[in-house]
């Protein structure tokens, strides 16, 4: 009797699955806290980028209790460079909720009540933590499903179709290993470019294997990102200290430290500033930001809330990648602890 696609994939995974720091061996018990941290970090971020951050984070916060009790700025400091800082704040809040209620969520309804957890993260967490029959979908899975069934319409138009086919394929007896297996298939074999179709365990089922446009599947047609212009200011006092401010706890880059900046090119200070003729470009999820860099040397404190700190002490404060790029553009290196 012919094996099912899920069984074939599980056999392939047993021999070829990736060794990742948040994974256990096939069939072993999984720590739900470990999965929770990894799932938050993996939202919109590649496995390769996450691994070093995950290792440092787990060393600093080995238990959910230690994370729940932590100061948010300590968490931000470990998150620096990973981006999407709202995830760090949401993970902290979720850890506090779980510790307070005394249990990890074991149903989709329970998981969706937690901050920062949507339907895809909920499915991954439940499947990987408790081997529950949830359908896991990430970028790798979307690519595999679209190619397997030759789905060429824009992803936004066929989301429900992708989810239905992914659910149909999911192994109900071993959803945890199946989830890891299909994600690994996309990461190792059914890659965005140069997919290795000849050694794919699902080759005989794939409706796109002979396509000349395989690398264009899935169809990720999107509108071009809106561009915004602005100015950022590196302000020094007579001692050479640099002025920093802290963002509010809501919105873009919330809770992080930064150099004063504005989303327009109108000067925001009454004192004289110098245009360095340098600028940086940073891409966010929905727009691209171009910032011109200005410097100033002043005697008094600027007309906004903030503080002067010695440049070498900048490493003590959580800064976004955007602000580090600004500093490095002028000073070559951002201080490290």
Tell where the protein language model's regions lie, with residue ranges:
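Catalytic cores of DNA base-excision repair glycosylases
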Residues: 3-198, 202-207, 211
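Intrinsically disordered, low-complexity, charged terminal extensions of DNA damage-control enzymes
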Residues: 1-24, 28, 187-337
């Amino acid at each position: 009797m012919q094996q099912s696609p899920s069984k074939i994939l599980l056999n392939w995974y047993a021999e070829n699955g990736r060794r990742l720091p948040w994974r256990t061996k096939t069939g072993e018990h999984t720590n739900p806290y470990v999965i929770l941290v990894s799932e938050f970090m993996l939202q919109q971020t590649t496995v390769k980028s996450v691994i070093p951050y995950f290792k440092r984070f787990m060393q600093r916060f080995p238990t959910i209790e230690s994370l729940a009790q932590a100061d948010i700025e300590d968490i931000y400091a470990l998150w620096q460079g990973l981006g999407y800082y709202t995830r760090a704040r949401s993970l902290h809040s979720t850890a506090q909720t779980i510790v307070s209620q005394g249990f990890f969520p074991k149903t989709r309804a329970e998981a969706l009540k937690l901050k920062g957890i949507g339907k895809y993260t909920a499915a991954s967490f439940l499947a990987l933590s408790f081997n529950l029959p949830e359908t896991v979908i990430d970028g790798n899975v979307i690519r595999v499903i679209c190619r397997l069934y030759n789905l060429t319409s824009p992803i936004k138009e066929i989301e429900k179709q992708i989810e239905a086919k992914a659910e149909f394929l999911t192994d109900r007896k071993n959803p945890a290993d199946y989830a890891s297996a299909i994600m690994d298939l996309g990461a190792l074999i059914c890659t965005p470019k140069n997919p290795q179709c000849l050694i794919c365990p699902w080759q005989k089922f794939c409706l796109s294997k002979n396509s000349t446009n395989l690398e264009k599947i899935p169809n990720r047609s999107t509108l071009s990102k809106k561009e915004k212009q602005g100015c950022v200011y590196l302000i020094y006092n007579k001692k050479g200290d640099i002025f920093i401010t802290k963002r509010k706890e809501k919105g873009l880059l919330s809770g992080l430290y930064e150099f004063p900046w504005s989303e327009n090119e109108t000067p925001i200070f009454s004192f004289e500033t110098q245009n360095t003729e340098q600028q940086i470009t940073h891409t966010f999820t929905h727009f691209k930001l171009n910032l011109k860099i200005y410097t100033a040397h002043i005697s008094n404190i600027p007309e906004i809330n903030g503080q002067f700190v010695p440049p070498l002490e900048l490493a003590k404060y959580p800064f976004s990648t955007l602000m580090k790029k600004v500093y490095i553009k002028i000073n070559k290196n951002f201080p490290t602890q």
